[in-house]
């Protein structure tokens, strides 16, 4: 696997020098300063590429080229935003950057309720608490019809939880959910958030798939023409939330994408921490079935709790994800490609890490502190080395 590291640009508290010392050779980054929907110019792409290469690294993957909400709702200037997206892909290809991670999650990107969940060893992790999320949706957001998405027990527990929250607790929970986590390109006030949710009131799973198909049928031929590999990131968490449909959550969703636009440019990001939240997702089977289309991997693990919809981010080699079997399946896919004469490795990044050691004293991007990811990268690197030596060395 190609060892990569997500970097949020010049304002990231983790420097490119840090990235290189961590042992990564590739950088995963994006032009976050360009508004959603606008074209990434060749000039801006080359500026970022030069910064990365001057540090002795390569820009391996774009994560992400965000998709404008008009495209997801099939309203407004969606045709112009699609045309802009096509041009951005052409410009990236011209600059030699040919792997693009993206997602089609409506309104929100990845979602957590607690950004400082303290683990038994004193390090901090990200957590999604189903009851806290219900408390937000039922008692802070007050979304009409939200009760239908929860069990009677969850509704009762959410009422108790809300009653014990201080004003600061409520404000923190609201910020965590709607203000935008690292990599998310949108942040909202509560009123703005309600208005954006309203735009989806008539969009169910079938309709969102229809809108996604319009996007894919416009984008994938351009990607194929210029040699760009599109790698869709799964929903996080991989299930409907806030009354919003989610359409990249299961192996059935992956098959739908392939059936909709059957091009090798139409591929996947295997994010084990997102897909792995669902007990019914067999990660190894997903890799084996769609291996030739996996162009990027995010390797991390989560741990489901007593309420199976509640989870926290576990250490990379712990939790519900069998990281050994996952890495073995990825390495097997790389060797299959090599047998076909393809030499490209699959970029992997240690997705998220615990806030630990000296980073506990620093301001860090949630999930993206240096030391936790350094630990995760080293652990995954060790797993891969053992697999390569045991099964593939001659």
Swiss-Prot record:
EC numbers for this chain: 4.2.1.8
Keyword Iron applies: yes
Molecular-function GO terms, alphabetical: ferrous iron binding; manganese ion binding; mannonate dehydratase activity
Gene Ontology biological process terms from the UniProt entry: D-glucuronate catabolic process
Pfam family, one: UxuA
The organism's place on the tree of life at top rank: Bacteria
Requisite cofactors: Fe(2+); Mn(2+)
Class in the EC hierarchy, top level: lyase
InterPro entries tied to this protein: Man_deHydtase, Xyl_isomerase-like_sf
Keyword set, alphabetical order: Iron, Lyase, Manganese
Catalytic activities: D-mannonate = 2-dehydro-3-deoxy-D-gluconate + H2O
Pathway: Carbohydrate metabolism; pentose and glucuronate interconversion
Segments passing through the bilayer: none
NCBIfam families given in the database record: PRK03906.1 (NF003027), uxuA (TIGR00695)
Function in brief: Catalyzes the dehydration of D-mannonate.
Family, as annotated: Belongs to the mannonate dehydratase family.
Protein name: Mannonate dehydratase
Organism: Escherichia coli O81 (strain ED1a)
Gene: uxuA
């Amino acid at each position: 696997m190609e060892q990569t590291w997500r970097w949020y640009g010049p304002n990231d508290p983790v420097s490119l020098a840090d990235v290189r010392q961590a042992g990564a050779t590739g950088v995963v980054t994006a032009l976050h300063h360009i508004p959603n929907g606008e074209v990434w110019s060749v000039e801006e792409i080359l500026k970022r590429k030069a910064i990365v290469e001057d540090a002795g690294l390569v820009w391996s993957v774009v994560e992400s080229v965000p998709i404008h909400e008009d495209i997801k709702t099939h309203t407004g200037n969606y045709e112009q935003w699609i045309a802009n997206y096509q041009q951005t892909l052409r410009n990236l290809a011209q600059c030699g950057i040919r792997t693009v991670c993206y997602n089609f999650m409506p309104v929100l990107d990845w979602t957590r309720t607690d950004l400082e969940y303290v683990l038994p060893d004193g390090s901090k992790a990200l957590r999604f608490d189903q009851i806290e999320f219900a408390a937000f949706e039922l008692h802070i957001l007050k979304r009409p019809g939200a009760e239908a998405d929860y069990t009677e027990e969850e509704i009762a527990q959410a009422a108790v939880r809300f009653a014990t929250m201080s004003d600061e607790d409520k404000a923190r929970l609201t910020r965590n959910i709607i203000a935008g986590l690292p990599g998310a390109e949108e942040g909202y006030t509560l009123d703005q958030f309600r208005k954006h949710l309203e735009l989806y009131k008539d969009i169910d799973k079938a309709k969102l798939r229809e809108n996604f198909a319009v996007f894919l049928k416009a984008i994938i031929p351009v990607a194929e023409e210029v040699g760009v590999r599109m790698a869709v990131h799964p929903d996080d968490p991989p299930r409907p939330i806030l009354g919003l449909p989610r359409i990249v959550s299961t192996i059935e969703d992956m098959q739908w994408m392939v059936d909709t636009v059957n091009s090798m440019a139409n591929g996947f990001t295997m994010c084990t921490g997102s897909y792995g939240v669902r007990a019914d997702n067999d990660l190894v089977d997903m890799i084996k079935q769609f291996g030739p289309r996996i162009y990027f991997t995010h390797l991390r693990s989560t741990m489901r709790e007593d309420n199976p919809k509640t989870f926290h981010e576990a250490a990379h080699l712990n939790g519900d994800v069998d990281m050994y079997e996952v890495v073995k399946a990825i390495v097997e896919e790389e060797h299959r490609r090599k047998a076909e004469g393809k030499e490209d490795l699959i970029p992997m990044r240690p997705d998220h890490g615990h806030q630990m050691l000296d980073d506990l004293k620093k301001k860090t991007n949630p999930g993206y502190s240096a030391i936790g990811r350094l630990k995760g990268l080293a652990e995954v690197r060790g797993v891969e080395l053992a697999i390569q030596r045991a099964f593939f060395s001659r």
